[in-house]
């Protein structure tokens, strides 16, 4: 049965290493017969959470007028969510963290999803990249029924669009 797959790419560079891995993931998901949409955060306007508590204290929609609400709506509708980030100082990039924070208003509706992570870093040691994965897992810990299905590690990706990007992925099938 086809799944609705949402890929969220937080690479600040079109064609950056994590973005290229998103495209490869997308290709495989489409070949498997899934419906796939890729959102590139750099092409969207997503402001940081202001901590106003309108959503958490009063149950009202976030008052900010940007693209975050639309992205969260797509996360709620998806069966599979792929979160992709370059690794900066052993953690996810700011664009991804801002998007995660903006899920606050509706995170209780992001339920029973399959999650994949894509990370690309200059680091050659996968163990050093685990802090980034831990950040994603912190988000998943707040959701109901998430299933972490796999991680694609783009290691040794120091330069933009590194042509010899070595991707190591866990066993994961969509």
Segments and roles (model prediction):
Residues 45-69:
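Cysteine-cluster motifs in flexible loop/terminal segments that predominantly coordinate metals
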Residues 63-143:
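Helix-loop-strand module that forms the ligand-binding subsite of alpha/beta enzymes
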Residues 35-44:
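A short beta-strand-loop structural module common to alpha/beta enzyme folds
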Residues 141-154:
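A charged, well-structured terminal subsegment
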Residues 3-32:
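N-terminal beta1-alpha1 ligand-phosphate binding loop
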Residues 9, 40, 152-153:
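Residue-level recognition of beta-strand->loop/alpha-helix junctions
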Residues 163-170:
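Conserved small/polar residues in nucleotide/adenosyl-binding loops
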């Amino acid at each position: 049965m086809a799944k609705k797959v949402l890929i969220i790419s937080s690479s600040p560079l079109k064609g950056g290493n994590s973005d290229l891995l998103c495209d490869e993931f997308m290709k495989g998901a489409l070949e498997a017969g899934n419906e796939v949409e890729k959102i590139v955060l750099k092409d969207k306007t997503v402001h940081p959470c202001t901590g106003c508590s309108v959503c958490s204290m009063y149950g009202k929609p976030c008052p900010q007028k940007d693209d975050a609400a639309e992205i969260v709506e797509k996360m709620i509708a998806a069966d599979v969510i792929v979160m992709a980030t370059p690794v900066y100082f052993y953690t996810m990039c700011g664009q991804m963290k801002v998007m995660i924070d903006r899920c606050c208003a509706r995170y209780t509706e992001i339920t029973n999803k399959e999650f994949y992570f894509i990370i690309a870093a200059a680091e050659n040691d996968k163990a050093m990249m685990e802090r980034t994965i831990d950040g994603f897992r912190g988000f998943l810990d707040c959701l109901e029924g998430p299933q972490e299905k796999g991680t694609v590690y783009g290691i040794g990706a120091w330069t933009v669009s590194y042509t010899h990007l070595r991707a190591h992925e866990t066993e994961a099938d969509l």
